[in-house]
Design a protein with these regions (language model features):
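Rossmann-like dinucleotide-binding domain that binds NAD(P)(H)
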Residues: 1-52, 58-63, 135
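A general structural signal for well-ordered alpha-helical segments in protein cores
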Residues: 5-6, 114-118, 144-145
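C-terminal helix-rich "cap/oligomerization" subdomain common to oxidoreductases
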Residues: 48, 119-161
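Structural motif
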Residues: 51-52, 75-77
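Beta-strand scaffold of nucleotide-dependent catalytic cores
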Residues: 54-57, 80-82
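Glycine-rich Rossmann NAD(P)(H)-binding loop
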Residues: 56-60, 70-74, 160-161
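Active-site loop of classical SDR/Rossmann-like NAD(P)-dependent oxidoreductases
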Residues: 62, 106-117
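Short polybasic amphipathic segments
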Residues: 69, 85-97
Length: 161
């Protein structure tokens, strides 16, 4: 359930993670447990230089599709917030209220999917290598497999090179 987050983490970290520790539980849907998976999970990725990435996922939110990113560094912080259905926000004595997050990933990433397809077609047309490429997909899968093993065995796992 977090393969895309693991892939993105590689680019945000700027270097390959070398170790993963994962935890998970079933808090929402018994059918997911019966399928051998979790509905709530967290991983910590560590790089050789000591960079740390924490990813948390849940299969269900009550307020729309939740996808956020924060990067903290020695000179500041970068935050990518949820995309809301609209930008209207009201303020009253009881507090602030805004629109819901977009309800589904297709709405949230429509422009990104179109840009991705355009880039892929351009790469194929010009004979260049698309980004991400097959090696990027393989690396994300190796991290996911190591995270699954970590969750199953309850220990940190080295990510294969």
């Amino acid at each position: 359930m977090m393969i895309h987050d693991l892939d993105m983490a590689r680019f945000v970290l700027g270097e390959e993670p070398v170790e993963v520790f994962a935890v998970g539980s079933n808090l929402i849907d018994e059918a997911i447990r019966e399928a051998g998976d979790v509905d709530t999970a967290a991983v910590i990725l560590t790089t050789a230089s000591g960079r740390i990435c924490q990813i948390t996922n849940s299969r269900r939110t009550t307020y729309g599709y939740d996808k956020r990113l924060e990067v903290h560094g020695s000179k500041g912080m970068l935050r990518v917030s949820n995309v809301l259905e609209n930008l209207v926000e009201s303020a009253k004595i009881t507090g602030f209220q805004s629109a819901l997050s977009q309800p589904f990933f297709l709405e949230r990433f429509e422009a990104a999917y179109l840009a991705e397809m355009k880039h892929f077609v351009e790469a194929v047309s010009t004979g260049s290598t698309p980004i991400p490429n097959a090696q990027d997909g393989l690396r994300a899968q190796l991290i996911a497999d190591a995270a699954t093993l970590s969750w199953q065995e309850g220990r940190a796992v080295a990510i294969p090179k």
